[in-house]
Structures are given as structure tokens and as C-alpha cells.
Amino acid sequence: MAVLRPVDMRMQPAPYEGRMKVIHKILEQLQKYRPRKANLEGLAVQWEHEVAKRSSSKHGYMFNASLLLRDIARHKGNLNRQGRYEAPAPQVSKAEVLAALRNLVLSEQVLSENGYVTAQDALESAAEEKEGLETCVRCLKKFDVRDIMVPTQCQFHVLKEQYNKDMRTFQYRCCGEIGTSCTPFALGCKTLEHHVFRPCTYAAMSKLLPFRNTRGVEGETNVLALDCEMAYTSCGYELIRLTVVEFWTNAVLFDEIVQPLGEIIDLNTQFSGVHEIDRAVAKTFEEAREVFLSPAMINENSILIGHGLENDLNVLRIIHDKIIDTAILYPNGKFKSSLRNLAFQELSRRIQTGEHDSSEDAIAAMDVVKHKLGIPLDRKTW
């Protein structure tokens, strides 16, 4: 009789106790359908090991184990000639994947804790926002937002500082300047003529454009990955590009440049990839929203996938409660992993090597979720 314990692995996809439970469930199924078959204990251990080798996360492991248990019941425990379990990944149904995706949807409390605007925020009365002093998000100086288009000096670092273990100090990634430096570049390696601000409260954001709750936008259940690019304008922080990708087919449903309401200060080309906006061609925000907030695209039944989606939904002025955020699914200690690092870690894929591309980012976040569930990234038929 084989020892009923999981095979040791260098990288465990799930805790020991969880793997033991799966082995016992497999054994129970085999004993039910093939009670006279020899060495069922060994087969249970072997088949669990096959599942573990295919899984890169606890959630993916549990999903793959559920498929194995389903197949044992479906095929009455019949074995192939080698006595091995061959995972039928292409046979995973759309309904099963949809159920697994729903298990990844974040609760309203988690959404609120991570900066998402929720229905509760919209219900609570907010104090009237008054125009006046704002803090520049780049140089951190106070300025009068009514003078935002008046040329001034804004000196800042393009990228945040990061701890350098070798130097044992914080260092700016954009220029290598040390955080405690007293040189002229200590305040920043770049200088522009305007301060910029970013409204963060529900009241401040609603003042420019009202939020719309997807509840009431009827439509069939769909799964969409999305990513936005933003620019700084005289009105704050606005949408300038939106990409929406369909989960099941990898089809790009929407990829448009969108006109901001305010006068453009900085398109953030280094990060947005947007070089110019032709107002004669680009859709206005309202024109774009008529398309992306609709029964055929983002509706009350949509599951939305993205990385740090609170920023995207804020500029889209959407309140939605079915969110899968890869930044929250894969925490990095007290911090959140960047999509660039996450794509390399989970997919061995390098992204954002040049200017950002919202379609590349949307697909990367979507593929991270597919990888988590053990779904082939190239599968397009269901």
C-alpha cells in the first residue's frame, strides 16, 4: 500500500493540508467507482501530483483539482493505459471558468479599502468642493488651481525613489539621484512650466464629470479586460485612451483616443504612449461613454479585469462591483506589484519596455488571471 501523502515539490502550489484533502477526495472517488482496482492509494497520490505540477498558485491548484474530481465522476474512474491522469484543459467549459472568475471578484469592502468609488460613496452626501489651493502631484508645492495655465516652475523627479540595498539608501530610478542629496537635482531632474493636480475625492471628481453606476445598464454576462491612459489637463487628471479586450476570444472591442475636457498640460507620453490628440477626429468623453458603457460592452453583469483598476474606473467615472484586480490578487508585502513585474513573474513576459500601450497592459492583466486559473493563453474557442 502506497503512503498517502503528497509528493514533495520544490515549489508547492498549495499548503500540505490542502493537498492532503485533495488526495483523500480523489481516493474516495476512485474507491467509489473502481473499488476492485489495485493500488488506488498510489493512483490518488500520482494524480494529485499531476495536478500540482500543472498549477502555479493555490487558486489554480484548487481549480485544476476540481476538474480532476469532475472527470473521475464523469468517466466513472476509468483509467488510461498508462494509469496516469491527463488534464483535459481544452475541455474546461465556459461555465466552469466563469464560476472560477466569480470567486476572484473582490468584495465591496476590499474595493473601498483600495480606493475604488463604491455605491456607498455615491449615497453619502459630500461637502461642496471649493476651488482654490491644490497640491501639485509632481513637486508637492501648493498652488492656486485657478492659475494652473499661468507658466511657473515645477521641478520634480519623473520616477519614484527606490531603496538601493548596496548603497543602503533611497535612490530615484529616473536619474540615480540619492534622496538625501543636497545637489541642485535633489528637488528633481525635470522642470516643466505648469503644476498639475489630481482630484481624489468622489465630490471633486464628480464636479467635473458625474459618476454613473453600471447597475441599470442591462446586458448579458461578459468578461472584459481594460486599461486606460490619462493626461494632466487644466481640469485635473483625465482619460485620453481606453482599450477593452474580450476575455474569451482575446478580441479588442474598443481602442480609442478620447478628448479630455480641459486644456492639455501634459499627455504623459512616456507613460501613456499618446503623442497628440486630434480633436476633429477623437471622440468626446460622452461619445466614448455611450459606446463603452452599454449592453454590448460594460454593463451591470460584466466582470472587469485590470491592474490597479481604481484609477481607470475613476477617470471613466464608473461605479462597478464585479472587479478582478491583479494588483490586489498578487500583493507584494505592504505594497502592490507593478504589472510589469507581475507579467514577468507569472508569464515570463516583458512589457512596458518602451512607451506604455494600453492594449498590451489590458492583455497582460487578463493573461495573468488566465494563468492563475490554468487556462491556455491562446485558447479562443469555447
Swiss-Prot record:
GO-annotated molecular function: 3'-5'-RNA exonuclease activity; exonuclease activity; nucleic acid binding
Domain Exonuclease: 223-369
Entry keywords, A to Z: Cytoplasm, Exonuclease, Hydrolase, Nuclease, Nucleus, rRNA processing
GO BP of this protein: exonucleolytic trimming to generate mature 3'-end of 5.8S rRNA from tricistronic rRNA transcript (SSU-rRNA, 5.8S rRNA, LSU-rRNA); regulatory ncRNA 3'-end processing; rRNA 3'-end processing; U5 snRNA 3'-end processing
Coiled-coil regions listed: none
UniProt-listed Enzyme Commission number(s): 3.1.-.-
Keyword Transmembrane helix: no
InterPro entries tied to this protein: Exonuclease_RNaseT/DNA_pol3, REX1-like_exo, REXO1/3/4-like, RNaseH-like_sf, RNaseH_sf
Primary localization: cytoplasm
Top-rank EC class of the record's enzyme: hydrolase
Disulfide-linked positions: none
Entry GO terms, CC: cytoplasm; nucleus
CDD domains linked: REX1_like (cd06145)
Biological role stated in the UniProt entry: 3' to 5' exoribonuclease required for proper 3' end maturation of MRP RNA and of the U5L snRNA.
Family to which the UniProt record says this protein belongs: Belongs to the REXO1/REXO3 family.
Protein name: RNA exonuclease 3
Taxonomic source organism: Eremothecium gossypii (strain ATCC 10895 / CBS 109.51 / FGSC 9923 / NRRL Y-1056)
